Curated annotation (Swiss-Prot):
Binding site for ATP: 12-20
Protein's recorded name: Cytidylate kinase
Family: Belongs to the cytidylate kinase family. Type 1 subfamily.
Cleavable signal peptide: none
SUPFAM superfamilies reported for this sequence: P-loop containing nucleoside triphosphate hydrolases (SSF52540)
Originating organism: Aliivibrio salmonicida (strain LFI1238) (Vibrio salmonicida (strain LFI1238))
This protein's encoding gene: cmk
């Protein structure tokens, strides 16, 4: 007998607050968590650890298919556990990002990782954070949410985050970067950023995180 495992997808542009929302939903629902944005970095790191050539589809595909990774919500952070080891800080390194770009360019690797992401949908349920979770990866998900916010608000949030780290940045530069990324994401040929037809669209521009979580939970309860 197969146990039904509900899937909640949360898509949206960079800086809308998807990560925080997904982490809180996973904690409140007791569900598993998938941070799809980190999955290519995780694979790149696994390849480096195992000495697999970053340009070798032959070596990367089996690694992707059997990727031993968990995403665990702890406090206000998501810990990434690769083969039993916390690699959260390693994932943020620039060289990991560059390696991820190389593996993401390989079609067979992308297909293998797509199947691996779908395997996260296991009991008791899954909250999946990304840009195409509801439109490509989990098209049959019971609950689909698209979290948005104005580019100005997202730039403002990012600026506050950087200032808290002691970094001074110009608002207009941040805004320009976000607008350029939005344009790329929404107009790309493969899996453009858009809400699924049956998604709840939440605009968090003038909402705090508690309000966003409350609306999301109400929607989830109405669907499950």
């Amino acid at each position: 007998m197969t146990i039904h495992s509900p899937v909640v997808t949360v898509d949206g542009p960079s800086g809308a607050g998807k990560g925080t929302l997904c982490m809180l939903l996973a904690e409140k629902l007791g569900y598993n968590l998938l941070d799809s944005g980190a999955i290519y970095r995780v694979l790149a790191l696994a390849a480096i650890h195992h000495g697999v050539d970053l340009g070798s589809e032959e070596g990367l595909v089996p690694l992707a298919a059997n990727l031993d990774v968990q995403f665990k919500a702890e406090g206000d952070l998501v810990k990434v556990i690769l083969e039993g080891e916390d690699v959260s800080s390693e994932l943020r390194k620039e060289e990991t990002g560059m390696a991820a770009s190389k593996v993401a360019a390989l079609p067979q690797v992308r297909e293998a990782l797509l199947r691996r992401q779908r395997a996260f949908a296991s009991a008791p349920g899954l909250v999946a954070d990304g840009r195409d979770m509801g439109t490509v990866v989990f098209t049959g998900a019971e609950v689909k949410i698209f979290l948005d916010a104005s580019a100005e608000e997202r730039a403002n949030r990012r600026m506050k985050q950087l200032q808290q780290k002691g970094l001074n940045v110009r608002f207009d530069r941040l805004l320009s970067e976000i607008q350029e990324r939005d344009d790329r994401d929404r107009n790309r040929a493969v899996a453009p950023l858009r809400p699924a037809e049956d998604a709840l669209v939440l605009d968090s521009t003038s909402m705090n995180i508690d309000e966003v979580v409350a609306q999301a939970l109400t929607f989830i309860e109405s669907k499950l």
